[in-house]
Amino acid sequence: MRLFLFCTALILVASSSVHATEALLFNGGGYTIQIMVGYEDDPVVAQVFFTPPGAKDWIVLPSEGLQIEKFDMEKRTLTMNFSNKNNPDLPRSFSLSVKKARAALSISGKEIKGEFNWDI
């Protein structure tokens, strides 16, 4: 199922004007966030996948709930917020802050420290 969702998302992104070709990864506290990077003139966040602790399948986060405040591949910084308006099929609202290889996920009143992989 995870592979199917991943392939479906890649097809959707590839058919748009932004082509996602690379992925960045957060791991911490059982949470995994995969960020697909697309390119127009500069790198952009094209799609985000989320897996909570104990889950087997990725959840594709809708772009209308995502706010990318900072994203700089050269400086290796990312600040991203996800807002959930009471959809039980999606994760709770969260924020992810990344500086180089260190990351912090704030969700459900907890701050979870983790690693961020910028290697593409």
Regions found by a protein language model. Give the residues of each.
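Sec-dependent N-terminal signal peptides
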Residues: 4-14
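Sec/Tat signal peptide C-region and signal peptidase I cleavage site
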Residues: 16-20
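Central antiparallel beta-sheet cores of small beta-barrel/beta-sandwich binding domains
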Residues: 21-89, 94-120
